[in-house]
Swiss-Prot record:
Function of the protein: After binding acetylcholine, the AChR responds by an extensive change in conformation that affects all subunits and leads to opening of an ion-conducting channel across the plasma membrane.
Protein name: Acetylcholine receptor subunit gamma
InterPro entries the record matches: Neur_chan_lig-bd, Neur_chan_lig-bd_sf, Neur_channel, Neuro-gated_channel_TM_sf, Neuro_actylchol_rec, Neurotrans-gated_channel_TM, Neurotransmitter_ion_chnl_CS, Nicotinic_acetylcholine_rcpt
List of glycosylated residues: N163
S-S pairs: C150-C164
Main location class: membrane
Taxonomic source organism: Gallus gallus
Substrates-to-products reaction catalysed: K(+)(in) = K(+)(out); Na(+)(in) = Na(+)(out)
Lineage: Eukaryota, Metazoa, Chordata, Craniata, Vertebrata
Length: 514
C-alpha cells in the first residue's frame, strides 16, 4: 500500500508541476517586463521616431439619436494596436509563452479619446487587459458607450437622414509622435466601421446607409507650421424610418384636417356649426404642432417638413373659418339692408352655377304669382292690420264678435233680401251692405298687396341664400384642391430627400467591405 501511494503522488506531481511551472513563468515574464518599465514614456528608440497606432471601430449597437439634444449614443469596441520594444521576450526562455495578458494600467497607452463627446467622458469606459506578444506588439480591445455630438438637420423631419461623426484623436501626442492609422487586414485597409452581424443589434428608428472612416491631418483650425494635428473620423450616415411618425402623427393629422374641408357640405346658413368644427380642427392641429416642437431641436435655422405641413393645414383651416363667416353674412342679407345688383345676379345666380354643376330654381314665366300658400292665420293678421289702419268709425258693426267676420255680416244682409223674393227688398239689402262690401274689398286688396310684398321679400331673401350657396361651392373646390395639392406637394419633397448613393460627393469609393 505504501508503494502504491507513493506512485500515485508521483503521478499527481507530474500533472500539477507543469501548470505551476507555466504559471510561475508568466509571473516571472511579467515581472521581468515590468522591471524598469515606465508607462508614462513613449515606446520610441529615438526622439524623432513616430509610433504607429492602428484603429478599428466595431459597432455593436446604435442605441439612439436624440434630436432635441443632438446626441448620438452608440455601443462600440475600439480595437487599437501598436508596438512597444520594451515588452519583447524570447518565448523559448519562458516555456514558449506566445501572449501575455497585462492590465492596461501597467503599460503605455496612446491616450486615444473621443473628441466630440457631449457628456465629458473622453476616455474608455472599461479598461480591459491588453494582449502582449513576443515581438512587442500590443492588442487592446476595450468596450465603450459613447455619447457624441451630432448636428441635426431638421429640414425634412421626419423623412430626414443625418450624417453623424465620431472623432478620435490622441489627447497627449501629436502626429510627430504617434501616427494614427486605420487597421489593415489581409492587405486591405479597413476604411469603414466594422459591424459584426452576430453581435450587432439593429435600431428600430434608424437605418445605416454608409459607415466610412477617414484620417485627417491639419484640419482647417491649424496651419502646416503648427504641430501636426491628426484625427481619425468615423462617419455614420443614417436614414430615418418614418413609419412611426406616419402612423401616429401624419395620418391622424390628415384625417382630422380633412374634416375641416367637409364643413362645406353643411348648409350655407349653418355658419355657426361650420366655425365650431373648423376651430376644433384648428385646436387639434395645434396639439400636433406642439408634439413636434417637443421632438426637434430648438433651432431657427430651418423649419421641419412636418411643421411646414401643419402650418399649411392651420392656414387652410383659418381660411375655411373666414369663408364660413362670409357665406353666413351673405346668406342672412335682406332687401332692407342690401340690394342685389344685376351683375351680381347674373354672375352668381346664372353663370357660375352652370360651371359648378349646381341646379338653380327656374323663374316661372308671366306675371309674378304667389309661390306659397298662406295660412288663414296669416290672412287674419293682415286683416287686423287693415282694421288698425282704418278709422274706428268705419269699423262699427252690430255685434263686437263680428269685428273679424266682415263677410258674415254682408251675407246676412244679402240673405234677407233674397228671402223676401222681392227685387226691391234685394236692392235695399245690397244698398245696406255696400259699406261692408267696400270694407271687405279694401281689406282683400290690402291683404293681397301685403302678400305680394312678402313674396317679393322672400324671393329676394332666397336669392341671397342662393348666392351664399354658390360662394360656398366655389370655396369648397378651391380649398379641396389646395388641401390635396399642398399635401401631395409637401410630401413629394420628402420623397426626393434620400441619403446619397456615395458617402462623399465626388469620391467614387463606397467605403464598404468587398
Amino acid at each position: 500500500m505504501r508503494c502504491s501511494d507513493l506512485l500515485l503522488l508521483f503521478l499527481l506531481a507530474l500533472c500539477v508541476l507543469p501548470g505551476i511551472s507555466c504559471r510561475n513563468q508568466e509571473e516571472k515574464l511579467l515581472q521581468d517586463l515590468m522591471t524598469n518599465y515606465n508607462r508614462h514614456l513613449r515606446p520610441a528608440l529615438r526622439g524623432d521616431q513616430v509610433i504607429d497606432v492602428t484603429l478599428k471601430l466595431t459597432l455593436t449597437n446604435l442605441i439612439s439619436l436624440n434630436e432635441r439634444e443632438e446626441t448620438l449614443t452608440t455601443n462600440v469596441w475600439i480595437e487599437m494596436q501598436w508596438s512597444d520594444y520594451r515588452l519583447r521576450w524570447d518565448p523559448d526562455k519562458y516555456d514558449d509563452i506566445q501572449q501575455l495578458r497585462v492590465p492596461s494600467a501597467m503599460v503605455w497607452l496612446p491616450d486615444i479619446v473621443l473628441e466630440n463627446n457631449i457628456d465629458g467622458t473622453f476616455e474608455i469606459t472599461l479598461y480591459t487587459n491588453v494582449l502582449v506578444y513576443p515581438d512587442g506588439s500590443i492588442y487592446w480591445l476595450p468596450p465603450a458607450i459613447y455619447r457624441s455630438s451630432c448636428s441635426i438637420h431638421v429640414t425634412y423631419f421626419p423623412f430626414d437622414w443625418q450624417n453623424c461623426t465620431m472623432v478620435f484623436q490622441s489627447q497627449t501626442y501629436s502626429a510627430n509622435e504617434i501616427n494614427l492609422l486605420l487597421t489593415v487586414e489581409e492587405g486591405q485597409t479597413i476604411e469603414w466601421i466594422f459591424i459584426d452581424p452576430e453581435a450587432f443589434t439593429e435600431n428600430g428608428e434608424w437605418a445605416i446607409k454608409h459607415r466610412p472612416a477617414r484620417k485627417i491631418i491639419n484640419s482647417g483650425r491649424f496651419t502646416p507650421d503648427d504641430i501636426q494635428y491628426q484625427q481619425v473620423i468615423f462617419y455614420l450616415i443614417i436614414q430615418r424610418k418614418p413609419l412611426f411618425y406616419i402612423i401616429n402623427i401624419i395620418v391622424p393629422c390628415v384625417l382630422i384636417s380633412s374634416m375641416a374641408v367637409l364643413v362645406y357640405f353643411l348648409p350655407a346658413k349653418a355658419g355657426g356649426q361650420k366655425c365650431t368644427v373648423s376651430i376644433n380642427v384648428l385646436l387639434a392641429q395645434t396639439v400636433f404642432l406642439f408634439l413636434i416642437a417637443q421632438k426637434v431641436p430648438e433651432t431657427s435655422q430651418a423649419v421641419p417638413l412636418i411643421g411646414k405641413y401643419l402650418t399649411f393645414l392651420m392656414v387652410v383651416t383659418v381660411v375655411i373659418v373666414v369663408n364660413a363667416v362670409i357665406v353666413l353674412n351673405v346668406s342672412l342679407r335682406t332687401p332692407n339692408t342690401h340690394s342685389m345688383s344685376q351683375r351680381v345676379r347674373q354672375v352668381w345666380l346664372h353663370l357660375l352655377p352652370r360651371y359648378l354643376g349646381m341646379h338653380m330654381p327656374e323663374e316661372a314665366p308671366g306675371p309674378p304669382q304667389a309661390t306659397r300658400r298662406r295660412s288663414s292665420l296669416g290672412l287674419m293678421v293682415k286683416a287686423d292690420e287693415y282694421m288698425l289702419w282704418k278709422a274706428r268709425t268705419e269699423l262699427l258693426f252690430e255685434k263686437q264678435k263680428e269685428r273679424d267676420g266682415l263677410m258674415k255680416t254682408v251675407l246676412e244682409k244679402i240673405g234677407r233680401g233674397l228671402e223676401s223674393n222681392c227685387a226691391q227688398d234685394f236692392c235695399q239689402s245690397l244698398e245696406e251692405a255696400s259699406p261692408e262690401i267696400r270694407a271687405c274689398v279694401e281689406a282683400c286688396n290690402h291683404i293681397a298687396n301685403a302678400t305680394r310684398e312678402q313674396n317679393d321679400f322672400s324671393s329676394e331673401n332666397e336669392e341671397w341664400i342662393l348666392v351664399g350657396r354658390v360662394i360656398d361651392r366655389v370655396c369648397f373646390f378651391i380649398m379641396a384642391s389646395l388641401f390635396v395639392c399642398g399635401t401631395i406637394g409637401i410630401f413629394l419633397m420628402a420623397h426626393f430627400n434620400q441619403a446619397p448613393a456615395l458617402p462623399f460627393p465626388g469620391d467614387p469609393k463606397t467605403y464598404l467591405p468587398p
